Design a protein with these regions (language model features):
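Binding-site signature for planar aromatic cofactors or substrates
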Residues: 1-222
Length: 222
């Protein structure tokens, strides 16, 4: 495991290691489509605060622990209108954090369609989702720029690897754990809507920097 400094930032490094500047939307995380819905449903204040408070520029120790203990993650890729979401599994530790905002994972024997890797060759922007379904309610979303590594020596050091995928991570975002079921305990999320439509409030909505800026129609607004 690579120990990384903790801390939060409103800016993240790009694929070349340089900090990514905000786009025309005034955000490095949100585009105009996100902004349109935030404004329509009175969510911009919350979105901006979460970006500033929760989006990180480098992995914190808890991020590294979740990633390197994960037996699987979900990978999203897209190119030329072909959008794909793939399950990637392996022994815990098969995803390795290799830098403050960089990781690698092996590509194992598959079905020869190369849907994910083919998309990466055409468009390196990817999304990764790590979730713990064991009752801890942990979720981590990553965005980054992926590239294929075909160094025979490095590949030979990882049992079963056909090649490696390196990801320069641009967005590290620990996401709200609501709705994640406890599969180990066969228990549904405690935050699912009740028969009367009410829901338990998540902890984050009560934080001092969030509770007073919730959208006007938020069911947990005080």
């Amino acid at each position: 495991m690579v120990a990384m400094p903790s801390g939060e930032s409103a800016r993240s490094p790009g694929a070349d290691g340089a900090a990514r500047e905000p786009a025309a939307s005034g955000s490095a995380l949100f585009h105009d489509g996100n902004r349109a819905l935030q404004d329509r449903f009175d969510g911009r204040r919350v979105a901006d605060t979460l970006e500033a408070r929760r989006r990180a520029a480098a992995f914190a120790p808890e991020h590294v622990a979740l990633i390197e203990a994960a037996p699987f993650f979900f990978l999203a890729t897209a190119a030329e209108g072909a959008v794909d979401c793939s399950f990637k599994g392996g022994p815990p530790g098969f995803v390795r954090v290799t830098g403050p905002a960089e990781l690698e994972f092996p590509d194992y024997d598959g079905n020869s369609m190369y849907l994910s890797l083919g998309n990466i060759l055409k468009s390196p922007s990817i999304g990764m989702l790590f979730i713990a379904f064991d009752g801890r309610s942990l979720r981590l979303r990553l965005r980054g720029q992926a590239s294929l590594v075909e160094d025979p020596v490095r590949i030979a050091a990882i049992p079963g690897a056909r090649r490696l995928v390196r990801v320069a991570v641009t967005d590290i975002f620990p996401n709200c754990p609501r709705y994640i079921p406890d599969l180990a305990g066969s228990a549904p999320s405690a935050y699912l809507p009740r028969p009367d439509g009410s829901q338990r409030a998540p902890e984050w909505k009560g934080r001092d920097y969030i509770r007073d800026i919730l959208p006007r129609d938020d069911p947990h607004r005080v």
